[in-house]
Amino acid sequence: MMAKWMSVAQVKEKIKESSAEEVTSRYLEVIKKSKINGYLTISDKALEQAKKIDKEGHEGPLAGVPIAIKDNISVVGLPNSCGSKILEGYVPPFNAHVIEKLLSAGAVILGKTNMDEFAMGSSTETSHFGPTANPWDLERVPGGSSGGSAAVVAAGEAPFALGSDTGGSVRCPASFCGVVGLKPTYGAVSRYGVVAYANSLEQVGPLANNVEDIAVLMDVIAGYDRRDSTSIDSKTEYQKALVDDVKGLKIGVPKEFFGEGIHPDVEKAVWDAIHKCESLGATWEEVSMPHIKYALASYYIIAMSEASSNLARFDGTRYGFRAGGENWHAMVSKTRAEGFGTEVKRRILLGTYALSAGYHDKYYLKALKVRTLVKQDFDKALSKVDLLMAPTMPNPAFKIGEKIEDPLTLYLSDINTCPINLAGVPSISVPCGFTDGLPIGLQIMGKPFDEETVLRAAYTFEKNTDYHTKRPPEVA
């Protein structure tokens, strides 16, 4: 009998005992019984991939290990809808760089996961294909925009998954679903083949049930890619960072991340986690990051501005959904009006406004200046300490439908995660407690390309607590 939740090491051991085909088949059976709407597409080639790995005796680091992929990452032969009507039916003819790396390592792609439309959201409610449910409470959101990826990992429907993080889209659902999610340093992982939302902010990131599996996946997908000029070969060896020891580490606690509106149980759980690290030999001190209070506004202006440009390419002319029209202009107008959802249209309009003549300097340029100040806050704080620790999300998962009609309230969900994207530094969310049966995430932030220290601290905390071993009763 195969356990529902297994680490990558356990999956590889199971493959040795049986076969990649049997392991893949077991995951596909679990997915068929799913209650959460985590997958948009199941690969009809998954079993074929697994059989080929068995036959050829593939010796890659992920040989036969199944993985789920967010539906904005291109995979040959699988739809890449980005959770949108406008890309419904689009199947890319090429693989994203991270998919090339995964396939070379022997991974088996189970399917594509649900997401907020074009990664614009924090709840996976803006998907054209309906919301994903949180495995811990099916009436609550899993977070977003990589909600499908986090939810299928939490539900035991994949051992790990890939997401993308533009303003918290890996860490938010990791926190809400009680899994581990890493946003790598900007440039650590190639973005080639990932449908762009906001190029200067987003990174591909892994989600898993433990820190070790995050490191395993990063060792496969990270590195330079000539097709992404922002990518860098940092020479990081992620698995070697997994040392159960935080002695001597200096932790900074930014008071601005514990602002008004934080749930008291979240605040307590995070402070308990910090004190746990202190008991294991780390020290902590409070640090101030005065410009963080402007980060959310800066983030949304920059992200929406970049989105208004990036999404101009979707017009029904070349691929995806096309509406009728008397002429080309009418067709494009109608296609975009019908093909994009409400939230995407809102962000395109606001981004276009921020970039328009007369407002560019007032909004967009000012937001870029604030971004520089936020980056300087991180540089200054991290010059004094090795790490920063804070809540990933100020509150636990909220009810489906609770905030979707109030975009400003929904945007506030990103208040603790978007500053990291503005600064481009690495950040991981690890489970650190519960409130009313809902997971709480601890956010650990580090210096650029110092994922080793971030993973070391996360791994040590995980090894000395048991939060990551808890499983959602809704799907157990």
Curated annotation (Swiss-Prot):
Record-level GO cellular component terms: glutamyl-tRNA(Gln) amidotransferase complex
Pfam family, one: Amidase
Gene3D superfamilies reported in the protein's UniProt record: Amidase signature (AS) domain
Keyword annotations of the record: ATP-binding, Ligase, Nucleotide-binding, Protein biosynthesis
Biological processes per GO annotation: translation
Catalytic activity reported: L-glutamyl-tRNA(Gln) + L-glutamine + ATP + H2O = L-glutaminyl-tRNA(Gln) + L-glutamate + ADP + phosphate + H(+)
Primary role: Allows the formation of correctly charged Gln-tRNA(Gln) through the transamidation of misacylated Glu-tRNA(Gln) in organisms which lack glutaminyl-tRNA synthetase. The reaction takes place in the presence of glutamine and ATP through an activated gamma-phospho-Glu-tRNA(Gln).
PANTHER family: GLUTAMYL-TRNA(GLN) AMIDOTRANSFERASE SUBUNIT A, MITOCHONDRIAL, TRANSAMIDASE
NCBIfam families in the cross-refs: gatA
Protein name (database record): Glutamyl-tRNA(Gln) amidotransferase subunit A
Species of provenance: Methanosarcina mazei (strain ATCC BAA-159 / DSM 3647 / Goe1 / Go1 / JCM 11833 / OCM 88)
